[in-house]
């Protein structure tokens, strides 16, 4: 299925590219998320007429993500308090939602979908380095300190 990308998509293309993707990917993800439109003649003409507007929107989103990344880097660390046993193992775990809430409480708006936990939920006390993907091209890390209650 031919689509026109309205956003930069990693491993797929940039704003304005016409790409061929599987039908399900287009119908279930790209089009509902507003990241692409079907490549019909009318849509191609519409996009070419408004190409500068879409590129400017993409540039502002990138700039906003970079500004948020700088704010997260300026935080240095975030502390989360949780119940834990004597050996440092948590009763439960710290998930992406808990980390996003803690960073938001510290003053930087972050959604749980932007938090990347490579090893899964945090299950021990101590320092953990957490990665954030704020945009397709913008990554940052933050030290999360889990303390026993």
Swiss-Prot record:
Which UniProt keywords are present, listed alphabetically? Ribonucleoprotein, Ribosomal protein, RNA-binding, rRNA-binding
Name the InterPro entries on file: Ribosomal_bL9, Ribosomal_bL9/RNase_H1_N, Ribosomal_bL9_bac/chp, Ribosomal_bL9_C, Ribosomal_bL9_C_sf, Ribosomal_bL9_N, Ribosomal_bL9_N_sf
Which cysteines form disulfides?
A: none
Q: Which GO terms describe its molecular function?
A: rRNA binding; structural constituent of ribosome
HAMAP family according to UniProt = Ribosomal_bL9
Instruction: Name the NCBIfam families on file.
Output: L9
Protein name stated in the entry: Large ribosomal subunit protein bL9
Q: Which organism is it from?
A: Actinobacillus succinogenes (strain ATCC 55618 / DSM 22257 / CCUG 43843 / 130Z)
State the gene name recorded for this protein. rplI
